[in-house]
C-alpha cells in the first residue's frame, strides 16, 4: 500500500488557517467599506438640506462651499451627533412696514433694530412722525411711536397691502440688516450681561463670565430654544442666530441684505439711502434721517466700550471659545457673507 508523507496527508489545519485568514480579510474589507459608506453619508449631511444648500451655493460659490464643508466636518463628530447649531429654526419675526413706499424691514435685536424701527415708523407716516418725534434716537423700542401701528409678526401681511395706495407700482422691497456674528454677540453680552444687572438670573447667573454665558447659551440653542412652545428668554432674543429670525428658510432670497458696521454707520446709511431713494422717498426725508441717526448713538450702544474690547480679546485669543462661537453661528457667517473664522 502506497504511503504519503505525513505533511501531505494532514492538511486540515492548513485549510482551517486559510479559511480563517480569508474570513478575517473579508471582514476587514467589509468593515472598511462600511466605514467609508458612513463617512460619505456623514459628509453628504452637509448638503442634505436642498434649500439651504442652494442658498449657500448662491452666497459662497463652489470653492467657498468646499471650505465651509471642511469646517463642518471638523465640528461634527458623526452623522448622529453634530455640534453645529442648525439654521432656520422658526423663532421670531418683527416686520415693520411703510406701505406708501412699498418698503418693509424685519428687525433683529442688536442689528440696529431700534434705529430701523424708528426709520420705518417715520416712513409709515412722515407728517405724524415729524409732528410728534423730534429726536429719532429717543424713539426707543419700549415706548416707540408706532407701537402696534405698522408692526407684524409674519411677512404674509405684505399680501394684504397689495392694493394699498402707493407712490410706486414696484413690488415690495424688503430690507434685512445683519451683523458680523462675534460683533453682535459681544454687543448683546455687554448690553445684557454687563450693564443690565437688575433682572432676575441675568445671563444665566454667569455675571460677566463670557465663557459661562456662551456655554449656557449654546446648550439652550442646541436644545430647548429650538422648541417653539418654550418661552424664550431675553438672552435667546439677543444671542439666537440671525438665521432663526424673519422666516428666512422661505424668505431668504426676498430680502436685500444690508450689513451693519458700527464703526462706519455712514457707509451703511449710504447703501440704505440708495435703496430708499429708488422707492420714491424724497431727498429731504433721507437727509433728515441721516442727520438724526448720525447725531448720536442709542443709549444701549456698546461701541468703544473698554470692557467690550477686553471680552473680544478674551474670545479671539481662546481656541475653545472661537470654536464654540463658530458652532453657535456657523450659518450666520456663511449665509450673510462673513469670513468663517479659522478654528483649531
Label the predicted regions.
Residues 2-344:
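Membrane-interface amphipathic segments in extracytoplasmic regions
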